[in-house]
């Protein structure tokens, strides 16, 4: 099965009717199950895309999506920030009606109740195989915080997803590792991860103490543990073999998304893909560095468009 049918948001909403207040029956004919991919990008404005009139940067792959589907010029979001906007999308609920839906630290517990009937649950009930790839920022693990050295549960697999390859929070927050199906990718058990958002742990340098080690200037509290020359929000130590390389994050997201698509090309699938771009820190791959002529923000817009192009292929 390799159906690609552009959909408007209105065609998805009925699946979420009732969301967390019950288990709606979903009945979809076999011949009406197109593959569905949600692409969630942070900090991307309407003026950043050429399909919306941007003239100094070209986004041909996103433009093709706009030409084939529905381009919105008047829309509303439940929130303008990471965690609550994702919570609203996946649950169909207003985030301000529940506690703990503010921007989550990187060691937060899973903030969506596994008893909640999510969008992923609805898709799963309709016969779709479901996957989540990329930025998550909805917490992982039990109340009390996440232990990144063991299998993490509950996680995305407990709220409707069959597969996950996740950035636990954001790229500007520790821990700077990927999690695949509850396990930190590439973790050496002899170098366990410790994460804290209240005080420094370990002896890794920080942006506030060692600014000479930075390749990007810290701002807005981004002056804690330094990873890859970038100071993050929060402190971590350990997990050296599992640390991501910022310049390669977009490539990893594109790879894992396309691998999921290839594995399930003969069955209906639902893929939720959260990109790292164009959120800070903006660290484009060398293929895109300096290419936009608009600084790193312009470069990562090009990188985002490339990522979407890879998925569309």
Predicted regions and their residues:
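Bacterial N-terminal signal peptides that target proteins for export
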Residues: 1-10
């Amino acid at each position: 099965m390799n159906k690609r049918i552009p959909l408007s948001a209105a065609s998805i909403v009925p699946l979420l009717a009732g969301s967390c207040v019950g288990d709606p029956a979903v009945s979809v004919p076999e011949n009406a199950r197109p593959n569905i991919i949600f692409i969630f990008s942070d900090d991307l404005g309407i003026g950043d895309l050429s399909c919306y009139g941007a003239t100094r940067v070209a986004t041909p792959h996103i433009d093709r999506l706009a030409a084939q589907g529905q381009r919105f010029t008047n829309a509303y979001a439940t929130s303008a920030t990471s965690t609550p906007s994702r919570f609203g999308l996946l649950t169909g609920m207003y985030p301000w009606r529940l506690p703990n839906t503010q921007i989550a630290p990187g060691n937060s517990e899973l903030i969506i109740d596994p008893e909640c009937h999510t969008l992923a649950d609805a898709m799963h009930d309709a016969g779709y195989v479901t996957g989540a790839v990329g930025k998550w920022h909805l917490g992982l693990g039990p109340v009390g915080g996440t232990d990144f050295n063991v299998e993490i549960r509950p996680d995305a697999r407990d709220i409707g997803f069959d597969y996950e390859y996740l950035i636990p929070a954001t790229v500007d927050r520790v821990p700077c590792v990927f999690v695949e199906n509850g396990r930190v990718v590439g973790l050496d058990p002899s170098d366990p991860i410790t994460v804290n958002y209240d005080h420094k742990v370990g002896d890794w340098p920080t942006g506030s103490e060692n600014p000479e080690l930075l390749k990007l200037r810290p701002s807005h509290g981004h002056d804690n543990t330094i990873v890859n020359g970038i100071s993050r929000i929060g402190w971590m130590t350990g997990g050296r073999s599992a640390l991501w390389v910022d310049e390669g994050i977009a490539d990893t997201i594109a790879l894992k998304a396309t691998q999921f698509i290839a594995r399930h090309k003969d069955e209906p699938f639902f893929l939720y893909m959260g990109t790292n771009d164009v959120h800070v820190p903006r660290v484009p791959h060398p293929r895109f560095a300096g290419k936009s002529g608009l600084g790193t923000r312009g470069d990562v817009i090009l990188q985002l468009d490339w990522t979407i192009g890879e998925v569309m292929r």
